[in-house]
Curated annotation (Swiss-Prot):
Encoding gene (name): ppaC
Gene3D superfamilies per UniProt: DHHA2 domain, inorganic pyrophosphatase (n-terminal core)
Xref: NCBIfam families: PRK05427.1
Coiled coil: none
Cofactor note as given: Binds 2 manganese ions per subunit.
Cofactor(s), by name: Mn(2+)
Organism: Exiguobacterium sibiricum (strain DSM 17290 / CCUG 55495 / CIP 109462 / JCM 13490 / 255-15)
Location(s) in or outside the cell: Cytoplasm
UniProt cross-references to InterPro entries, sorted A to Z: DDH_dom, DHH_sf, DHHA2, DHHA2_dom_sf, Mn-dep_inorganic_PyrPase, Oligoribo/pAp-PDE_c-di-AMP_PDE
Keywords, comma-separated and alphabetical: Cytoplasm, Hydrolase, Manganese, Metal-binding
Presence of the UniProt keyword 4Fe-4S in the record: no
Lineage, highest ranks first: Bacteria, Bacillati, Bacillota, Bacilli, Bacillales
Name under which the protein is recorded: Probable manganese-dependent inorganic pyrophosphatase
Residues where Mn(2+) 1 binds: H9, D13, D75
One of the record's GO molecular function terms: manganese ion binding
Length: 311
């Protein structure tokens, strides 16, 4: 039987890893030879979840076309966020909760996207639809993804469906969602040992916005000041990254998981897009964004609309 690879976006977060594992597990239960793989390194938060529920991290793959002819995408659809050789394979399925952009196929594809806060919320439904019981360790990872994407149910992306799914998954996993969730978020928020390269790559995603090429990374922390102490080093490396990738704008969104506010470090020839989008003026390349915690719902849409107006 031909193998199918299941993977999420580059610079994987907890939802990407958990969704790949959970969906590959479901496909195997349904008789498909599926393997969850990853396109980048696992972050501290995700590793905490993997260790807690005793699940091995997926295998790292740099060229998916050397491994399989057919792939399934989870937690993303935009080609620039996917495998470098994504055009050399056939995408057969997509399970996602983001905007649909820069995505097309030559053949019909099973595409399931829902306006919920996390991909594993959708997968929880799919397990039920197929009558497959979720293993406790898989449920734990799926819960971890919801906690991560919703910042423990505080993000504006969080829906009632996410909360209900989290409660169900916590029961299966045998944990208290709030107690476990806070421990996991704190583990991921320790940025003290991160290198500059690791910081600017944290959950980094590339977007096409109007005529512009934009990259947005997000770092969750309990102390934004600690990160900003390294601003000079960050800016030097970001400027090099902008030149290397020919970016019009780079944003590092540093989010305080305790106050639910963010500080955005913005650089690039189109950095003023962020100022116009939020109606704020940057000071020393920094913008203070009160109440902003979600890149998907509070940053990408307003930036996309502002960029579109430039055309």
């Amino acid at each position: 039987m031909e193998k199918v690879l299941v993977f999420g976006h580059k610079n994987p977060d907890t939802d990407t890893i958990a969704s790949a594992i959970a969906y590959a597990e479901l496909k195997k239960e349904l008789g498909v030879h599926a393997e969850a793989v990853r396109l980048g390194e696992v972050n501290g938060e995700t590793q905490f979840a993997l260790d807690y529920f005793k699940v091995a991290r997926p295998r790292l793959v740099t060229e998916v076309s050397k491994e399989a002819q057919h792939v399934i995408l989870v937690d993303h659809n935009e080609r620039q966020q996917s495998a470098d050789d994504i055009d050399a394979v056939k995408v057969t399925e997509v399970i996602d909760h983001h905007r649909i952009a820069n995505f097309e196929t030559s053949d019909p594809v099973y595409y399931r996207a829902e306006p919920v806060g996390c991909t594993t919320t959708i997968l929880n439904k799919m397990y039920k639809e197929h009558g497959v019981a979720i293993k406790p360790e898989i449920a734990g990872l799926m819960l971890s993804a919801i906690v991560s994407d919703s910042l423990l149910f505080k993000s504006p992306t969080c829906t009632e469906q996410d909360v209900i799914a989290a409660r169900e998954l916590a029961t299966i996993a045998g944990v208290d969602a709030n107690v476990y969730g806070l421990d996991m978020l704190k583990a991921g928020a320790d940025l003290s040992k991160k290198t500059i390269d690791e910081l600017i790559a944290l959950d980094a995603k590339e977007f096409s916005m109007g005529p512009f090429k934009v990259e947005i990374a997000q770092a969750n922390t309990v102390d934004t000041a600690e990160v900003l102490l390294r601003q000079a080093e960050l800016e030097t490396r970001i400027e090099a990254l902008i030149a290397e990738k020919d970016l019009n704008l780079y944003m590092l969104l540093v989010t305080d998981i305790l106050t639910n506010n963010s500080v955005a470090l913005v650089l690039g020839p189109e950095a003023s897009l962020v100022e116009r989008a939020f109606g704020l003026e940057a000071t020393n390349h920094l913008l203070y964004l009160e109440g902003v915690v979600s890149r998907k719902k509070q940053v990408v849409p307003v930036l996309t609309n502002t960029a579109a107006a430039v055309e």
